[in-house]
């Protein structure tokens, strides 16, 4: 079947992974990828010709009624559907054309963490195998060793101003997708309004919001898009002193360093594996309980 474009459907953290996929599918496979709001199908009941589309539904639990309905209707509109979930008993996989398991084991935390990194790995493997680069499996096997044996500094919580609850997390390319997930965790766990922005979009207007009592997290990845973020640092330093660089450069002032695997896509997994333990410590340092985020439940039902 000739696939000419990809549609992703997801919510929350899974949608951040879907955004990530849009970059790597377009970059490596030349396939335009669009994140479809589930309500377009479930509430608006819009019709599409999906005969040349691959529809990828990402859901940790696979239980949200809107995502189950989106998969069913997408198939009826001619799509080949792929389900990425962590639940092998999910009703969403019964009729889908393909099922890709996250293999994250049970995730008890309310805020999704390891299912995000596992979803990234599934997406990365899918892309590289489509390119005929099956040796990506060997590179992935080395990841756990890199993460576990990382002797670099553990991110400290005391370098971040806990009294400032607003700011931006700025990235570009896959870094922007990761910025969306990082932003979500600041909101879910820390009750901080850290908004994600592309570094290019910030320059088009939102930088006007920046003042000295404003946090700026700058996420630099080892790819062409990430380099542009690093180039913006000097200008942004004119607007606030609260700048925190997340980088593979061990000399960054803010000490938010993560080691590089030399494959930018896999660097994403290393970075998030470093971020998640830190955000737990940071949340605790603020006097909040990361296992009991306010108003949230493990499975969110929407339609």
Locate each region found by the language model.
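Glycine-rich phosphate-binding loops that contact phosphosugars or nucleotide phosphates
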Residues: 2-146, 152-153, 172, 207, ...
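Conserved phosphate/anionic-ligand binding catalytic regions in large, soluble enzymes, centered on
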Residues: 20-21, 181, 185-188, 272-277
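Short, flexible hinge/linker loops that cap or flank conserved catalytic cores
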Residues: 48-49, 160-161, 210
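Active-site-proximal catalytic alpha-helix in oxidoreductases
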Residues: 117, 121-124, 177-180, 271-276
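A short, charged, Gly/Pro-tolerant segment at domain boundaries
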Residues: 141, 286, 290-303
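Acidic catalytic cores of enzymes that act on phosphate-bearing nucleotides/polynucleotides
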Residues: 163-232, 239-242
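Structured C-terminal subdomain patch of bacterial secreted/periplasmic proteins
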Residues: 252-289
């Amino acid at each position: 079947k000739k696939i000419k474009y990809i549609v992703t459907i997801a919510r929350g953290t899974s949608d951040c992974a879907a955004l990530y996929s849009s970059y790597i599918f377009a970059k490596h496979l030349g396939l335009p990828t669009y994140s479809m709001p589930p309500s377009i199908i479930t509430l608006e009941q819009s019709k599409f010709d999906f005969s040349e589309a691959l529809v990828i539904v990402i859901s940790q639990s696979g239980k949200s009624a809107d995502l189950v309905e989106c998969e069913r209707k997408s198939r009826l509109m001619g799509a080949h559907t792929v389900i990425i979930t962590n639940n092998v008993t999910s009703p969403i996989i019964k009729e889908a054309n393909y099922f890709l398991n996250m293999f994250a084991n049970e995730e008890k935390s309310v805020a999704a963490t390891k299912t995000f990194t596992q979803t990234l790995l599934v997406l990365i493997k899918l892309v590289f195998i489509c390119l005929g680069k099956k040796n990506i499996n060997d590179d992935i096997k080395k990841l756990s060793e890199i993460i576990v044996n990382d002797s670099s500094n553990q991110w400290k919580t005391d370098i971040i101003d806990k009294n400032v609850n607003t700011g931006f997390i700025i990235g570009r390319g896959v870094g922007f997708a990761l910025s969306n997930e990082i932003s979500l965790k600041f909101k879910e766990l820390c009750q901080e309004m850290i908004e994600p922005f592309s570094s290019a979009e910030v320059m088009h207007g939102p930088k006007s919001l920046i003042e000295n009592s404003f946090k700026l997290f700058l996420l630099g990845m080892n790819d062409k898009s990430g380099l542009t973020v690093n180039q913006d640092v000097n200008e942004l330093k004119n607007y606030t002193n609260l700048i925190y660089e997340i980088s593979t450069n061990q000399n960054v002032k803010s000490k938010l360093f993560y080691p590089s695997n030399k494959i930018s896509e896999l660097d994403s997994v290393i970075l998030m594996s470093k971020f998640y333990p830190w955000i737990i410590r940071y949340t605790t340092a603020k006097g909040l309980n990361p296992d009991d985020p306010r108003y949230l439940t493990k499975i969110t039902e929407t339609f």
